[in-house]
Amino acid sequence: MTLNLCVLTPNRIVWDSEVKEIILSTNSGQIGILPNHAPIATAVDIGILRIRLNDQWLTMALMGGFARIGNNEITVLVNDAEKGSDIDPQEAQQTLEMAEANLSKAEGKRQTIEANLALRRARTRVEAINMMS
């Protein structure tokens, strides 16, 4: 038995096919979803989506949003998403270093909050690459 996973951003469909299992980062922690999972709607945190296709695991960096699960269908609507295999490791590492530098230079609450979010997004992209290796 399989699940139909659809990952959408405001601009594109990132993923739309059948999967065996997923592990999703929510605001209350990670949840594993197998076929016949109880119906839920949940907020999606900035984090990694792990997708199992047969015996292979793939990763995707998600940038926050919402997910609806029911009737073996999972719809994930996020601000942005990138497959781990599509992320350039050097560019992701440079972005992480820039985000760390920007956080140390942040002045005031707003800049600190924005810098922290940028750092979380950058770390998630690097983590998506590292989970593939």
UniProtKB/Swiss-Prot annotation:
UniProt-recorded Gene Ontology molecular function terms: ATP binding; proton-transporting ATP synthase activity, rotational mechanism
Compartments where located: Plastid, Chloroplast thylakoid membrane
Keywords: ATP synthesis, CF(1), Chloroplast, Hydrogen ion transport, Ion transport, Membrane, Plastid, Thylakoid, Transport
Bilayer topology: Peripheral membrane protein
Tree of life domain: Eukaryota
Stored InterPro entries: ATP_synth_F1_dsu/esu, ATP_synth_F1_dsu/esu_N, ATP_synth_F1_esu_C, ATPsynth_dsu/esu_N
GO cellular component term of the entry, any: chloroplast thylakoid membrane
Statement: the UniProt record of this protein carries the keyword Glycosyltransferase: no
Function according to Swiss-Prot or TrEMBL: Produces ATP from ADP in the presence of a proton gradient across the membrane.
Family membership noted in the UniProt record: Belongs to the ATPase epsilon chain family.
UniProt subunit comment: F-type ATPases have 2 components, CF(1) - the catalytic core - and CF(0) - the membrane proton channel. CF(1) has five subunits: alpha(3), beta(3), gamma(1), delta(1), epsilon(1). CF(0) has three main subunits: a, b and c.
Protein name (record): ATP synthase epsilon chain, chloroplastic
Source organism of the structure: Morus indica (Mulberry)
